[in-house]
Curated annotation (Swiss-Prot):
PANTHER family: PROTEIN DPCD (PTHR31921:SF1). Pfam families: DPCD. Belongs to the DPCD family. The gene is dpcd. This is Protein DPCD. It comes from Danio rerio (Zebrafish). The lineage of its organism: Eukaryota, Metazoa, Chordata, Craniata, Vertebrata. It comes from the Eukaryota.
Length: 200
């Protein structure tokens, strides 16, 4: 089963851990050369950020792509042209039991939204009846484990100009995450500033 293959890939990956800013930061180097970086909140053990870097066609290092977490609005390009801050902002932020997406700066009433799972296309689709917003997105965690997309696991709500979409994690994912978290806690993570300095 693909869940076991992904679990094995995670176990075989070379892992480095660092504890900093109240987060456990873990870097994975996979056998195929791809890299994954994750950050977990130390108090809640929730995944705060996950990003990937895949090898390029010519074997070089590609750019980091964010899978979970919020993009940093103040980057190196802050002086250049940037999109309007009132545009809808799509991001993923997971909880212990659900995959969760938030779309900020979207102010229509709840009845305007339609969120559906498309099992044949293996994606979820957000539509508005006023045709002002449309978005397709997949769930990479389900793709990696080759688990089916269930429309009954999908729900959504709207508050404070933010549409919140939740997808209940399948039991296979919950079990895998618990096992992985147990292994990560066993990793000897260094803290910032914990560098061996020999006194003279």
């Amino acid at each position: 089963m693909a869940v076991q293959q992904w679990a094995d890939a995670l176990k075989k990956a070379k892992k480095t851990a660092l504890i900093s800013d109240g987060k456990r930061k873990v870097h994975y180097q996979f056998e195929d050369g791809n890299e994954m970086a994750e950050e977990y909140d130390l108090k809640t053990d929730e995944l705060v950020m996950r990003k990937w870097r895949h090898k390029t066609t010519f074997g070089g290092q590609g750019q980091w792509t964010l899978e979970v977490g919020e993009t940093n609005p103040t980057g190196a390009t802050s002086d250049l042209i940037k999109e309007n801050s009132s545009n809808p902002l799509f991001m993923r932020r997971d909880t212990k039991t659900s995959f969760q997406w938030r779309i900020r700066n979207i102010s229509y009433p709840l009845e305007v939204y339609s969120v559906t799972a498309e099992p044949m296309e293996r994606c979820c689709v957000i539509r508005t009846s006023n045709k002002k917003y449309y978005k397709k997105f997949s769930i990479p965690d389900l793709e990696r484990c080759q688990l089916p997309l269930e429309s009954t696991a999908l729900s959504f709500t709207h508050a404070n100009n933010t549409l919140i979409i939740s997808y209940k994690k399948p039991k296979e994912i919950l079990t895998l995450e618990q096992e992985l978290l147990g292994e990560l806690k066993k990793l000897k993570g260094t803290s910032e500033g914990d560098i061996d300095c020999k006194t003279q």
